Curated annotation (Swiss-Prot):
UniProt record similarity statement: Belongs to the universal ribosomal protein uS15 family.
Organism: Buchnera aphidicola subsp. Acyrthosiphon pisum (strain APS) (Acyrthosiphon pisum symbiotic bacterium)
PANTHER family named in the record: RIBOSOMAL PROTEIN S15, BACTERIAL AND ORGANELLAR, SMALL RIBOSOMAL SUBUNIT PROTEIN US15M
Protein name: Small ribosomal subunit protein uS15
InterPro entries per the UniProt record, alphabetical: Ribosomal_uS15, Ribosomal_uS15_bac-type, uS15_NS1_RNA-bd_sf
Keyword line: Ribonucleoprotein, Ribosomal protein, RNA-binding, rRNA-binding
Pfam families per UniProt: Ribosomal_S15
Gene Ontology biological process terms from the UniProt entry: translation
């Protein structure tokens, strides 16, 4: 949606430690965060797009669950990711 394939690969390499490792929690959170940021810009222009707003809420919920899982499993990786993405928590 908002990222090209090259940008996605760069994110996977940075947070997944290899090009194949796209399932790691940090990678999923970063990709969701980028999609959420793109949709926030979209909603500044299209205020009545309620179908996409529902998708945004689902993405925010999924990111919240992934962050809770990461916090429960490894607090140091969670803290580093929150600081790197500049998320409020």
């Amino acid at each position: 949606m908002s990222l090209s394939a090259i940008d996605t690969k760069k994110i996977i390499l940075k947070y997944g430690k290899s090009e194949q490792n796209s399932g790691i929690t940090e990678v999923q959170v970063v990709l969701l965060t980028n999609q959420i940021n793109y949709l926030q810009i979209h909603f500044s222009q299209h205020k009545k797009d309620h179908c996409s707003r529902r998708g945004l809420l689902n993405m925010v919920s999924k990111r919240r669950k992934l962050l809770d899982y990461l916090k429960k499993k490894n607090i140091s990786r969670y803290s580093a990711l929150i600081e790197d993405l500049h998320l409020r928590r």
